[in-house]
Amino acid sequence: MATGDDSFPWDQDSILSRDLFSATSTELCYENLNRSCVRSPYSPGPRLILYAVFGFGAVLAVCGNLLVMTSILHFRQLHSPANFLVASLACADFLVGVMVMPFSMVRSVEGCWYFGESYCKFHSCFEGSFCYSSLFHLCFISVDRYIAVSDPLTYPTRFTASVSGKCITFSWLLSIIYSFSLLYTGANDAGLEDLVSALTCVGGCQIAVNQTWVFINFLLFLIPTLVMITVYSKIFLIAKQQAQNIEKMSKQTARASESYKDRVTKRERKAAKTLGIAVAAFLLSWLPYFIDSIIDAFLGFITPTYVYEILVWIVYYNSAMNPLIYAFFYSWFRKAIKLIVSGKILRENSSTTNLFPE
């Protein structure tokens, strides 16, 4: 699945939209080529601001998710099936920051694709692969949290490392196979040959997607989304009931120490809440883009390019959101960051450091 200008052609709207940001005169991507795409560059001020905003997002996505992966893979205390899913999700977001955002940044600001026709298609495949991989990871994480909250005592025997590994493998393989096969078989632009031919120019990266595949893409987004909403609704109800039960028991045994089950339940509820926020952030970031894709496909690409650019970069910025959410809610992640940044992670036996408060 392509996003951004990959699936929306540069046309007069893109030229007009840049006037909103004080665009200079219209130029060509490649001045010496007859088939060059037209570009309408931003004036220096807005150009610098856009590079700063987009570049900051890429750096945040790379560094933040690298910290998440390093924390989970290095510290033995974090070696759990659920955390391996989180690390794999961070890997998808990390790859967005490395392999997608820098190239999209240049394309968005300069109005041209300077990285070759082959990488244009790869870039679009990477976008789709990482998008669906993140979505499937979040779906499996929601199921994991449901099991943990609904039955915390038997949870370790139900969601094992083997189950986690299968979820990770499924998330990556299905996403990659679907995205690459869609674009490399040409199924995405079947019936749009005339449009593709008319839009093709040197310095452009237009990946057209017909109505059928736009609808299928939307279904692939919608079905896991409905699963996550349903599961987290159940988690909310269970957590509410558990909180009421704990409150009743605390009144009856005010001086009694907290049971192991109660401690586990509280910990799992907090994890479910944090990951639920991550899911909500993902859906809020992606839903406007998918809705706009449906509208464009069936109404003839009516969205102005600058609006499309905004939607796409909201999607990209989602890849930088999860580490910020973890840092805000998880004390163990904040402690892990301090150890990594200070270099204490290089000390002998640092992997056995206790990251959880007593």
Swiss-Prot record:
Bilayer-crossing residues are 48-68, 84-104, 122-143, 167-187, 213-233, 275-295, 310-333
Q: What are the glycosylated positions?
A: N34, N210
Annotated GO biological processes are: adenylate cyclase-activating G protein-coupled receptor signaling pathway
| Location within or outside the cell | Cell membrane
What intrachain disulfides are recorded?
C37-C201, C120-C205
* Gene Ontology molecular-function annotations: trace-amine receptor activity
Keyword Transmembrane included in the entry's annotation: yes
Q: How does it sit in the membrane?
A: Multi-pass membrane protein
Q: Which residues lie on this side of the membrane: Cytoplasmic?
A: 69-83, 144-166, 234-274, 334-358
Q: Where is it made, tissue-wise?
A: Specifically expressed in neurons of the olfactory epithelium.
Phenotypic consequence of Y289C: Decreased trace-amine receptor activity in response to beta-phenylethylamine-binding
Checking SUPFAM superfamilies in the record gives: Family A G protein-coupled receptor-like
Q: What UniProt keywords apply to this chain's record, in alphabetical order?
A: Cell membrane, Disulfide bond, G-protein coupled receptor, Glycoprotein, Membrane, Receptor, Transducer, Transmembrane, Transmembrane helix
| Cellular component, GO annotation | plasma membrane
> Domain comment?
In addition to the well known disulfide bond common to G-protein coupled receptor 1 family, trace amine-associated receptors (TAARs) contain an unique disulfide bond (Cys-37-Cys-201) connecting the N-terminus to the extracellular Loop 2 (ECL2), which is required for agonist-induced receptor activation.
What family, per the record?
A: Belongs to the G-protein coupled receptor 1 family.
Q: Which PANTHER family match?
A: HISTAMINE RECEPTOR-RELATED G-PROTEIN COUPLED RECEPTOR, TRACE AMINE-ASSOCIATED RECEPTOR 7A-RELATED
Q: What does this protein do?
A: Olfactory receptor specific for trace amines, such as beta-phenylethylamine (beta-PEA). Trace amine compounds are enriched in animal body fluids and act on trace amine-associated receptors (TAARs) to elicit both intraspecific and interspecific innate behaviors. Ligand-binding causes a conformation change that triggers signaling via G(s)-class of G alpha proteins (GNAL or GNAS).
Q: What is this protein called?
A: Trace amine-associated receptor 7d
Which species does this protein come from?
Mus musculus (Mouse)
**Its encoding gene is what?**
Taar7d
